[in-house]
Amino acid sequence: MGVAIRDILADCKETLTWDDLSGIAALDAHNALYQFLSIIRQPDGTPLMNGAGRITSHLSGILFRTVNFLEKGIRPVFVFDGKPPEFKQETINERREHRARADEAWKTALREGDMEEAYKQASASARIDSHTIASSRELLDLLGIPWVQAPSEGEAQAAYMARQGKVTYAVSQDYDSLLFGSPVLVRNLTVSGRRKTRGRTITVNPERIVLSSFLDRLGVTREQLVKIGILVGTDFNPGIRGVGGKTALKIVRNGEFESVIAEKQPDFNPAPIRDFFLNPPVTDDYTLEWRTPDVEGVVEMLCGRYDFSEERVRSALAKVSVKATQKTLDAWF
Protein backbone atom coordinates (compact mmCIF):
# COMPACT_ATOMS: atom_id res chain seq x y z
CA MET A 1 0.00 0.00 0.00
CA GLY A 2 2.54 2.60 1.13
CA VAL A 3 1.92 6.22 2.01
CA ALA A 4 -1.07 7.87 0.26
CA ILE A 5 0.47 11.04 -1.16
CA ARG A 6 -0.28 10.48 -4.85
CA ASP A 7 -2.44 13.61 -5.16
CA ILE A 8 0.41 16.00 -4.27
CA LEU A 9 2.92 14.29 -6.55
CA ALA A 10 1.30 14.91 -9.92
CA ASP A 11 3.66 17.71 -10.99
CA CYS A 12 6.76 16.04 -9.58
CA LYS A 13 6.85 12.85 -11.65
CA GLU A 14 9.12 12.60 -14.66
CA THR A 15 8.36 9.96 -17.27
CA LEU A 16 11.51 8.13 -18.33
CA THR A 17 12.80 5.96 -21.13
CA TRP A 18 15.01 2.97 -20.47
CA ASP A 19 18.00 4.99 -21.69
CA ASP A 20 17.55 7.29 -18.67
CA LEU A 21 17.84 4.45 -16.16
CA SER A 22 21.38 3.11 -16.43
CA GLY A 23 23.10 2.72 -13.07
CA ILE A 24 22.59 0.72 -9.91
CA ALA A 25 18.97 0.17 -8.89
CA ALA A 26 18.05 -0.87 -5.33
CA LEU A 27 14.75 -2.72 -5.61
CA ASP A 28 12.35 -3.21 -2.73
CA ALA A 29 12.35 -7.00 -3.16
CA HIS A 30 9.01 -7.71 -1.50
CA ASN A 31 7.35 -4.99 -3.55
CA ALA A 32 8.82 -6.42 -6.76
CA LEU A 33 7.85 -9.98 -5.86
CA TYR A 34 4.27 -8.93 -5.18
CA GLN A 35 4.20 -7.26 -8.59
CA PHE A 36 5.46 -10.42 -10.29
CA LEU A 37 3.05 -12.65 -8.37
CA SER A 38 0.13 -10.34 -9.12
CA ILE A 39 0.73 -9.75 -12.81
CA ILE A 40 2.32 -12.94 -14.15
CA ARG A 41 -0.80 -15.09 -14.28
CA GLN A 42 -2.97 -16.97 -16.72
CA PRO A 43 -6.14 -15.26 -18.05
CA ASP A 44 -8.29 -16.83 -15.32
CA GLY A 45 -5.92 -15.56 -12.62
CA THR A 46 -4.12 -18.84 -11.97
CA PRO A 47 -0.43 -18.19 -11.22
CA LEU A 48 2.30 -19.97 -13.14
CA MET A 49 3.11 -23.30 -11.46
CA ASN A 50 5.29 -26.34 -11.99
CA GLY A 51 4.00 -29.89 -12.17
CA ALA A 52 4.13 -30.23 -8.39
CA GLY A 53 1.93 -27.17 -7.88
CA ARG A 54 4.72 -24.81 -6.77
CA ILE A 55 4.08 -21.22 -7.84
CA THR A 56 6.74 -19.97 -10.26
CA SER A 57 5.43 -16.54 -11.30
CA HIS A 58 8.01 -14.77 -9.13
CA LEU A 59 10.87 -16.78 -10.63
CA SER A 60 9.72 -15.94 -14.14
CA GLY A 61 9.57 -12.27 -13.18
CA ILE A 62 13.03 -12.28 -11.64
CA LEU A 63 14.63 -14.04 -14.61
CA PHE A 64 13.15 -12.09 -17.48
CA ARG A 65 13.00 -8.68 -15.80
CA THR A 66 16.57 -9.01 -14.54
CA VAL A 67 17.78 -9.93 -18.02
CA ASN A 68 15.92 -6.89 -19.32
CA PHE A 69 17.58 -4.70 -16.70
CA LEU A 70 21.05 -5.92 -17.62
CA GLU A 71 20.37 -5.43 -21.32
CA LYS A 72 19.44 -1.81 -20.59
CA GLY A 73 22.53 -1.06 -18.51
CA ILE A 74 20.78 -1.34 -15.14
CA ARG A 75 22.53 -3.28 -12.38
CA PRO A 76 19.87 -4.39 -9.90
CA VAL A 77 20.27 -5.23 -6.24
CA PHE A 78 17.27 -6.71 -4.42
CA VAL A 79 16.68 -5.54 -0.83
CA PHE A 80 14.62 -7.91 1.33
CA ASP A 81 12.51 -6.93 4.33
CA GLY A 82 13.64 -7.93 7.79
CA LYS A 83 11.66 -7.70 11.02
CA PRO A 84 8.76 -5.24 10.77
CA PRO A 85 8.24 -2.67 13.53
CA GLU A 86 5.60 -3.59 16.08
CA PHE A 87 3.29 -0.80 14.94
CA LYS A 88 3.04 -2.43 11.48
CA GLN A 89 1.31 -5.54 12.81
CA GLU A 90 -2.20 -4.15 12.39
CA THR A 91 -1.49 -3.40 8.73
CA ILE A 92 -0.03 -6.89 8.25
CA ASN A 93 -3.17 -8.45 9.72
CA GLU A 94 -5.43 -6.30 7.54
CA ARG A 95 -3.52 -7.27 4.41
CA ARG A 96 -3.75 -10.95 5.32
CA GLU A 97 -7.52 -10.63 5.70
CA HIS A 98 -7.78 -8.70 2.43
CA ARG A 99 -5.89 -11.43 0.55
CA ALA A 100 -8.16 -14.08 2.06
CA ARG A 101 -11.27 -12.18 0.92
CA ALA A 102 -9.76 -11.73 -2.54
CA ASP A 103 -9.04 -15.45 -2.74
CA GLU A 104 -12.68 -16.24 -2.02
CA ALA A 105 -13.84 -13.62 -4.52
CA TRP A 106 -11.53 -15.18 -7.13
CA LYS A 107 -13.14 -18.59 -6.65
CA THR A 108 -16.60 -17.04 -6.90
CA ALA A 109 -15.71 -15.23 -10.13
CA LEU A 110 -14.36 -18.46 -11.61
CA ARG A 111 -17.59 -20.28 -10.80
CA GLU A 112 -19.57 -17.48 -12.43
CA GLY A 113 -17.33 -17.46 -15.50
CA ASP A 114 -16.26 -13.81 -15.04
CA MET A 115 -12.63 -14.07 -16.15
CA GLU A 116 -11.88 -10.35 -15.89
CA GLU A 117 -13.06 -10.23 -12.27
CA ALA A 118 -11.31 -13.53 -11.58
CA TYR A 119 -7.98 -12.14 -12.77
CA LYS A 120 -8.47 -8.97 -10.72
CA GLN A 121 -9.26 -10.83 -7.51
CA ALA A 122 -6.55 -13.42 -8.08
CA SER A 123 -3.97 -10.65 -8.42
CA ALA A 124 -5.14 -9.16 -5.12
CA SER A 125 -4.78 -12.55 -3.42
CA ALA A 126 -1.04 -12.85 -4.12
CA ARG A 127 1.03 -13.75 -1.07
CA ILE A 128 4.70 -14.21 -0.25
CA ASP A 129 5.84 -17.10 1.91
CA SER A 130 9.19 -18.48 3.06
CA HIS A 131 9.54 -20.58 -0.09
CA THR A 132 8.99 -17.50 -2.26
CA ILE A 133 11.84 -15.74 -0.48
CA ALA A 134 14.21 -18.72 -0.45
CA SER A 135 13.70 -19.59 -4.12
CA SER A 136 14.05 -15.93 -5.13
CA ARG A 137 17.37 -15.62 -3.33
CA GLU A 138 18.61 -18.88 -4.82
CA LEU A 139 17.82 -17.69 -8.34
CA LEU A 140 19.43 -14.29 -7.73
CA ASP A 141 22.60 -16.03 -6.52
CA LEU A 142 22.70 -18.17 -9.66
CA LEU A 143 22.10 -15.11 -11.84
CA GLY A 144 24.99 -13.32 -10.13
CA ILE A 145 22.73 -10.57 -8.81
CA PRO A 146 23.43 -9.24 -5.29
CA TRP A 147 20.74 -9.07 -2.64
CA VAL A 148 20.72 -7.38 0.74
CA GLN A 149 18.97 -8.43 3.93
CA ALA A 150 17.53 -5.34 5.60
CA PRO A 151 17.23 -5.30 9.39
CA SER A 152 13.66 -4.02 9.02
CA GLU A 153 11.94 -2.31 6.08
CA GLY A 154 13.50 -2.97 2.67
CA GLU A 155 12.53 0.49 1.43
CA ALA A 156 14.35 2.08 4.36
CA GLN A 157 17.51 0.12 3.55
CA ALA A 158 17.28 0.96 -0.16
CA ALA A 159 16.82 4.65 0.66
CA TYR A 160 19.84 4.53 2.98
CA MET A 161 21.97 2.95 0.25
CA ALA A 162 20.87 5.68 -2.16
CA ARG A 163 21.73 8.42 0.35
CA GLN A 164 25.15 6.84 0.84
CA GLY A 165 25.76 6.87 -2.92
CA LYS A 166 26.02 3.08 -3.08
CA VAL A 167 23.13 2.89 -5.57
CA THR A 168 21.81 5.33 -8.15
CA TYR A 169 18.17 5.19 -7.10
CA ALA A 170 15.60 3.22 -5.12
CA VAL A 171 12.87 1.27 -6.91
CA SER A 172 9.39 0.69 -5.51
CA GLN A 173 5.75 1.16 -6.45
CA ASP A 174 5.17 2.78 -3.05
CA TYR A 175 6.17 6.30 -2.07
CA ASP A 176 7.57 5.35 1.34
CA SER A 177 11.09 5.55 -0.10
CA LEU A 178 10.72 9.33 -0.20
CA LEU A 179 9.75 9.50 3.47
CA PHE A 180 12.74 7.29 4.25
CA GLY A 181 14.90 9.85 2.45
CA SER A 182 15.83 8.28 -0.87
CA PRO A 183 17.19 11.11 -3.08
CA VAL A 184 15.60 9.49 -6.14
CA LEU A 185 12.65 7.09 -6.42
CA VAL A 186 11.86 5.22 -9.64
CA ARG A 187 8.43 3.63 -10.03
CA ASN A 188 7.07 1.17 -12.60
CA LEU A 189 10.49 -0.35 -13.28
CA THR A 190 9.29 -3.88 -12.56
CA VAL A 191 5.95 -3.46 -14.35
CA SER A 192 6.82 -1.21 -17.30
CA GLY A 193 5.75 -2.21 -20.79
CA ARG A 194 2.41 -3.08 -22.33
CA ARG A 195 -0.17 -4.46 -19.90
CA LYS A 196 -3.79 -5.46 -20.14
CA THR A 197 -6.11 -3.83 -17.63
CA ARG A 198 -9.90 -3.62 -17.57
CA GLY A 199 -10.13 -5.18 -21.00
CA ARG A 200 -7.69 -2.83 -22.72
CA THR A 201 -3.96 -2.64 -23.30
CA ILE A 202 -2.04 0.25 -21.76
CA THR A 203 1.61 1.27 -21.81
CA VAL A 204 3.25 1.70 -18.42
CA ASN A 205 6.43 3.77 -18.42
CA PRO A 206 9.00 4.17 -15.66
CA GLU A 207 8.76 7.43 -13.73
CA ARG A 208 11.22 9.26 -11.52
CA ILE A 209 10.67 11.49 -8.49
CA VAL A 210 13.59 13.54 -7.17
CA LEU A 211 13.13 14.16 -3.45
CA SER A 212 14.83 17.57 -3.32
CA SER A 213 12.72 18.90 -6.21
CA PHE A 214 9.58 17.46 -4.64
CA LEU A 215 10.27 19.10 -1.28
CA ASP A 216 11.15 22.42 -2.93
CA ARG A 217 7.93 22.39 -4.93
CA LEU A 218 5.86 21.71 -1.81
CA GLY A 219 7.86 24.11 0.33
CA VAL A 220 8.40 21.57 3.11
CA THR A 221 11.23 19.67 4.75
CA ARG A 222 11.57 15.90 4.79
CA GLU A 223 10.39 15.83 8.41
CA GLN A 224 7.30 17.77 7.38
CA LEU A 225 6.77 15.30 4.53
CA VAL A 226 6.76 12.52 7.10
CA LYS A 227 4.09 14.42 9.03
CA ILE A 228 2.02 14.69 5.84
CA GLY A 229 2.38 10.95 5.42
CA ILE A 230 1.21 10.27 8.96
CA LEU A 231 -1.86 12.45 8.44
CA VAL A 232 -2.94 10.69 5.24
CA GLY A 233 -1.88 7.22 6.36
CA THR A 234 1.16 4.99 6.03
CA ASP A 235 1.91 1.29 6.37
CA PHE A 236 2.13 1.97 10.10
CA ASN A 237 -1.02 4.01 10.79
CA PRO A 238 -4.42 4.50 9.12
CA GLY A 239 -4.28 8.29 8.91
CA ILE A 240 -7.12 10.68 9.67
CA ARG A 241 -10.42 10.03 7.92
CA GLY A 242 -11.16 12.65 5.28
CA VAL A 243 -7.61 14.05 5.17
CA GLY A 244 -5.93 13.71 1.77
CA GLY A 245 -2.57 14.90 0.58
CA LYS A 246 -3.56 18.48 -0.18
CA THR A 247 -5.32 18.97 3.15
CA ALA A 248 -2.41 17.38 5.01
CA LEU A 249 0.02 19.69 3.22
CA LYS A 250 -1.99 22.72 4.33
CA ILE A 251 -2.14 21.45 7.93
CA VAL A 252 1.61 20.92 8.09
CA ARG A 253 2.47 24.21 6.42
CA ASN A 254 0.28 26.00 8.96
CA GLY A 255 2.04 24.28 11.84
CA GLU A 256 -1.16 22.52 12.92
CA PHE A 257 0.05 18.89 12.82
CA GLU A 258 0.17 18.37 16.59
CA SER A 259 -3.13 20.13 17.26
CA VAL A 260 -4.97 18.19 14.54
CA ILE A 261 -3.63 14.88 15.84
CA ALA A 262 -4.62 15.85 19.38
CA GLU A 263 -8.13 16.74 18.25
CA LYS A 264 -8.84 13.91 15.81
CA GLN A 265 -6.83 11.05 17.33
CA PRO A 266 -6.11 11.96 20.97
CA ASP A 267 -4.95 8.42 21.83
CA PHE A 268 -2.45 8.25 18.95
CA ASN A 269 1.23 9.08 19.49
CA PRO A 270 2.84 9.80 16.11
CA ALA A 271 6.38 10.13 17.49
CA PRO A 272 7.46 6.46 17.09
CA ILE A 273 6.33 6.41 13.46
CA ARG A 274 7.94 9.77 12.71
CA ASP A 275 11.21 8.64 14.29
CA PHE A 276 11.09 5.35 12.39
CA PHE A 277 10.85 7.13 9.04
CA LEU A 278 13.64 9.55 9.94
CA ASN A 279 15.97 7.04 11.63
CA PRO A 280 15.04 3.49 10.60
CA PRO A 281 17.19 0.43 11.33
CA VAL A 282 19.67 -0.02 8.46
CA THR A 283 22.89 -1.92 7.87
CA ASP A 284 26.24 -1.54 6.13
CA ASP A 285 26.77 -5.29 6.21
CA TYR A 286 26.43 -6.06 2.51
CA THR A 287 28.54 -6.41 -0.62
CA LEU A 288 27.49 -5.24 -4.05
CA GLU A 289 29.08 -7.53 -6.60
CA TRP A 290 27.61 -8.58 -9.93
CA ARG A 291 28.90 -11.86 -11.36
CA THR A 292 28.42 -13.65 -14.65
CA PRO A 293 25.39 -15.94 -14.43
CA ASP A 294 25.84 -19.62 -13.68
CA VAL A 295 23.98 -20.72 -16.80
CA GLU A 296 23.92 -24.42 -16.02
CA GLY A 297 22.91 -23.71 -12.43
CA VAL A 298 20.00 -21.55 -13.58
CA VAL A 299 18.92 -24.20 -16.09
CA GLU A 300 19.09 -26.94 -13.45
CA MET A 301 17.00 -24.91 -11.04
CA LEU A 302 14.36 -23.48 -13.36
CA CYS A 303 14.08 -26.31 -15.87
CA GLY A 304 14.98 -29.27 -13.69
CA ARG A 305 12.91 -28.31 -10.65
CA TYR A 306 10.36 -25.77 -11.84
CA ASP A 307 9.52 -27.00 -15.36
CA PHE A 308 10.61 -23.88 -17.24
CA SER A 309 11.29 -24.17 -20.97
CA GLU A 310 15.01 -24.77 -21.36
CA GLU A 311 14.97 -23.03 -24.73
CA ARG A 312 13.46 -19.86 -23.22
CA VAL A 313 15.82 -19.86 -20.24
CA ARG A 314 18.95 -20.34 -22.34
CA SER A 315 17.75 -17.75 -24.84
CA ALA A 316 17.24 -15.20 -22.06
CA LEU A 317 20.65 -15.86 -20.51
CA ALA A 318 22.30 -15.68 -23.94
CA LYS A 319 21.15 -12.06 -24.20
CA VAL A 320 23.16 -11.23 -21.09
CA SER A 321 26.21 -13.05 -22.45
CA VAL A 322 26.00 -11.19 -25.76
CA LYS A 323 25.63 -7.87 -23.94
CA ALA A 324 28.61 -8.66 -21.75
CA THR A 325 30.84 -9.42 -24.73
CA GLN A 326 29.98 -6.06 -26.25
CA LYS A 327 31.62 -4.43 -23.24
CA THR A 328 34.25 -6.03 -21.08
CA LEU A 329 33.18 -8.43 -18.39
CA ASP A 330 34.80 -6.19 -15.78
CA ALA A 331 32.89 -3.13 -16.98
CA TRP A 332 29.60 -5.01 -17.02
CA PHE A 333 29.75 -7.25 -13.98
Swiss-Prot record:
Binding-site list for Mg(2+) 1: D28, D81, E153, E155
Residue span of region I-domain: 117-255
Keywords carried by this UniProt record: DNA damage, DNA repair, DNA replication, Endonuclease, Exonuclease, Hydrolase, Magnesium, Metal-binding, Nuclease
EC number: 3.1.-.-
GO molecular function: 5'-3' exonuclease activity; 5'-flap endonuclease activity; DNA binding; magnesium ion binding
UniProt cofactor(s): Mg(2+)
GO biological process: DNA repair; DNA replication, removal of RNA primer
One protein family per Pfam: XPG_I
InterPro entries: 5-3_exonuclease_C_sf, Flap_endonuc, Flap_endonuc_arc, HhH2, PIN-like_dom_sf, XPG-I_dom, XPG/Rad2, XPG_CS
SMART domains per UniProt: HhH2, XPGI, XPGN
Residues given in the record as Mg(2+) 2 binding sites: D174, D176, D235
SUPFAM superfamilies for this protein: 5' to 3' exonuclease, C-terminal subdomain, PIN domain-like
Stretch list, region N-domain: 1-99
The record's free-text note on cofactor binding: Binds 2 magnesium ions per subunit. They probably participate in the reaction catalyzed by the enzyme. May bind an additional third magnesium ion after substrate binding.
Cytoplasm listed as a keyword: no
Function of the protein: Structure-specific nuclease with 5'-flap endonuclease and 5'-3' exonuclease activities involved in DNA replication and repair. During DNA replication, cleaves the 5'-overhanging flap structure that is generated by displacement synthesis when DNA polymerase encounters the 5'-end of a downstream Okazaki fragment. Binds the unpaired 3'-DNA end and kinks the DNA to facilitate 5' cleavage specificity. Cleaves one nucleotide into the double-stranded DNA from the junction in flap DNA, leaving a nick for ligation. Also involved in the base excision repair (BER) pathway.
Family statement: Belongs to the XPG/RAD2 endonuclease family. FEN1 subfamily.
The protein's assembly and partners: Interacts with PCNA. PCNA stimulates the nuclease activity without altering cleavage specificity.
Protein name: Flap endonuclease 1
Species whose genome carries this gene: Methanoculleus marisnigri (strain ATCC 35101 / DSM 1498 / JR1)
Protein's gene: fen
